[in-house]
Amino acid sequence: MYRVLRLLPLPLSVAISLSALADEKPPNWGLCPATLPLQGFEQAPGMDKHVVQSRPQLPTNIEGDTLTGTARTPLYQGNVLMARGDQFLGADSVRMDTETDSYVAEGHVRYQDSSILVVADRAEGNQDTDVHKISNIQYQLIGRRGNGVAKSVDIHGQVGQTHEATYTTCDPSQAIWRLRAPEIDVDNVEGFGVARHAVFEVGQWPVLYLPWFKFPIDSRRQTGLLYPQLGYSGRNGFDYAQPIYLNLAPNYDATLYPRYMQKRGFMIDTEFRYLYDDGKWQTRAAFIPNDQLRDKDRGRFSFNGYHNIDNHWQARASLAWVSDTRYMEDFSSRLVGMSSLSSLQSTVGVYGTGETWTAGLMADRWQLTDYSLDESALAYNRQPRLFFNWDKPVFDFLEFGLYSEVVRFKHDDAYLVALQNDGNYLRTGEVIRYYGGTRLDVKPYLLLPFTGASWYVTPTFGWRYSSYYLDSGIAEQLNGNRTPVRSLPIISLDSGVYLDRDTSVFGRNYLNTLEPRFYYLYVPYRNQSDLPLFDTRAFTFSWGQLFRDSRYTGPDRQNDANQLTLAVTSRWLDQNTGKEDLALSVGQILYFKDSLVTLNDSEERIQQGKSVWVSDVAYNVNDRWTLNATYQWNPNFRRDDLASIRARYLIGSDGIINLAYRYRRNTLDGTTQLKQTDFSFLYPINPRWSAIGRYYYSLLDKKPLEIISGLQWDSCCLAVRTVLRRYMRDRTGNMDNSIQLEFVFKGLSSVGQDTDRVLRRAILGYYRDDLYLVPPSNTTTDPDAYDPNKIP
């Protein structure tokens, strides 16, 4: 029998509220039972947001084995089923009162919609007043595995109250943890819930008592405490932070991070975010009064934001400041040796982009953040920099372009430091004065791309004009000329051929390619000894260097050249899968004359003859084994200048082993510059236990750079990670130790230090998806990051 009426909404408060506490990143439920504790209606459809939003407009169908009673109080009995959209309600019997719009559902009451399953003994209420009461319920969230029980739920419109409720994502037969509360109030209008006298239990043991606990129940943000962060390190001792979130308005908020470090004292860290229609910005500031280890006040500040002026123009700023040169060492856990630890850059600018052009006006400043260095290690400040780039294809075979910029360079004076007998670095009192200047660099070019089905020839004709207006101090250090000028043509011819054939190796069919490439470059000599070095250095020789029109990063030097690059790449592509199993590349530059331009007196001239051989190999042995190698051989000195070998083995669905060897020679004096081994792994011992580790060792210094060891235990609803780490904390070789412990309560939150950040950096492939990220291209849409030496 069928009858159309409104269906009880049953917004189960406890389940809706506690599910909002889940992690943003989907947890791994692979160790959970294949079936959920509660099973739904076979007729129930999948999640459909459009159906959910249109529920009030949909009719309700009701059916049962028998219909008795009166017109006012019909009684449905036997396999009663009510359905509306994605909502289903089943019971042994449902009695209705059509005048008061009340109902009573009894016997095996079941409810299901797109997000939840509910089993109860009894449900009663009034659909007109929207007041309902559900007794002795068990619930199961769909998709999140959250489940629990409640003695009763009282619903008054959009406000609900649960009694004697629990929540866990564990299987009910093995509930490792659960959240229990005698009373939870939920306000769907305001978007928050309040739990009173809540207890968090692990096993049968209560581990956390919350007399009053307010939490969000939807995506709306709520002011309150976030989960604490715990850790221990040799530098700070016991480390505890308690984040406090402040939802100040719909478009701006703040987070406070009160932090206690056993060896340093108290620290306050703050973050403020502001969002509006045309942009957003974020500030972060930290302050530690009287750091007990340094005996002084310390702090930092950062600002990042942008504002969209119109469809073509955007203003951007990224500012950073720290109180002293030891701040980064003391409060950063990254390995040293990176420029980001020795200096901080602040930039502000206005940038524009169009279909054929980019332009901008910006300024930046560098701050020294390494106590063992002086200001001479800093880059020049650009205050300001104005640039304009234009590229316009005219025909299929003709393209015009222009790179141009004008920059005013400034530099802080360098106050020299020296290492003392006690191991500290102190100022010596000596000062090196730095001077700046203004540089104009213009680089127009004409490009003629000719292509065929299996070949291409691209001649390029460019011209570089650079002029300077130098401060008198820097001009005197050179040749005394304050307005030097350099002007010269740059001519190149890039060509290549694509050949392929069908072949078979060990019974597998391959498409084998042969891709020779020829790149000729001619640049006449210009004496550049009277030009300063503001932002120019030599590129590290690599495969990409074979095809650049300059071996320097900036316009202060443009090398002369009469050279030809010969290179070839061969690939083996599996014809069944399309995968590239093997790729071999080798190349070399032939110098037809000496290159007289050098960066400075310490750089040797390029002699007529041959460059080092550059080779790259990428071999995918199978779906689990990959090998990569890079090698550079110097035929002039009969020595290897660079070698890099990397092997990776994938274990199961998430395990990995990485092994790498890196070697680099200082090409100026022939000494070994770098010699390292790197071994890291995530090894699954069994489905629950896995070992993690890294041993990063310098063969040159005969000491480790980083050692990581740890264990992970995983289950359906709980994961525990413990990580022991020893790492180099500064460029002088001082080491530090840390202990990180993290408990991940799946579907709820994590407690302890965030181990993911450290492990993802140390173990490539710790997150398997990281292996398949597309590496950044050499090209960029950032108008402040263009390479003035690169012609497309």
Swiss-Prot record:
Pfam families: LptD
Location of this chain's protein in the cell: Cell outer membrane
Coiled coil: none
Signal peptide start-end: 1-22
GO biological process: Gram-negative-bacterium-type cell outer membrane assembly; lipopolysaccharide transport
Keyword Transmembrane: no
Keywords: Cell outer membrane, Membrane, Signal
Keyword Membrane appears in the UniProt entry: yes
Subunit structure: Component of the lipopolysaccharide transport and assembly complex. Interacts with LptE and LptA.
PANTHER family: LPS-ASSEMBLY PROTEIN (PTHR30189), LPS-ASSEMBLY PROTEIN LPTD (PTHR30189:SF1)
Family: Belongs to the LptD family.
Protein name, entry field: LPS-assembly protein LptD
